Amino acid sequence: MALRMLWAGQAKGILGGWRTICLVVSLFLQHPGVSSKCYFQAQAPCHYEGKYFTLGESWLRKDCFHCTCLHPVGVGCCDTAQHPIDFPAECEVLQEAGTCQFSLVQKADPRLPCKGGGPDLEWGSANTPAPGASAPHSS
């Protein structure tokens, strides 16, 4: 009888561990944004700016990371901001103060928005040609 109770307790512990892992994976899979950066801090406390959170509660940090309490396992966080990655060399990315929004501006004058000017075929998606242009021929 004692052995049966011990096995039941071990099985419950294993099942609880799998539930936690499934919760962590599902939270990260449900997060919007395909190119989001996510990380997990094992055994991290669930508090931010003096406020404590319980299992499943979440908060948005000032650096635009959305974090979820996975107590007692830790904290999982994903970047919610969409960062531009392919833009003309004469432009730069600026984060708007106090928001999770980004703007493309001219390096020469950050007050002016970036001028597109078409794709840069040397800096893009595997040197793919612009729509309507002929594909490069390999020799």
From Swiss-Prot:
Highest taxon above the source species: Eukaryota
Molecular-function annotations in GO: CCR2 chemokine receptor binding; cytokine activity
Keywords associated with the record: Chemotaxis, Cytokine, Disulfide bond, Inflammatory response, Secreted, Signal
Disulfide cysteine pairs (residue numbers): C38-C78, C46-C69, C64-C100, C67-C77, C91-C114
Pfam families for the chain: PSP94
GO cellular component, as recorded: cytoplasm; extracellular space
InterPro entries (alphabetical): PSP94 (IPR008735)
Main location: secreted
Chain residue ranges for the region called Disordered: 116-139
Gene Ontology terms describing biological process: inflammatory response; lymphocyte chemotaxis; monocyte chemotaxis
Extent of the signal sequence: 1-35
Location within or outside the cell: Secreted
Protein family according to the UniProt entry: Belongs to the beta-microseminoprotein family.
Biological role stated in the UniProt entry: Acts as a ligand for C-C chemokine receptor CCR2. Signals through binding and activation of CCR2 and induces a strong chemotactic response and mobilization of intracellular calcium ions. Exhibits a chemotactic activity for monocytes and lymphocytes but not neutrophils.
Descriptive protein name: Prostate-associated microseminoprotein
The species this protein was found in: Mus musculus
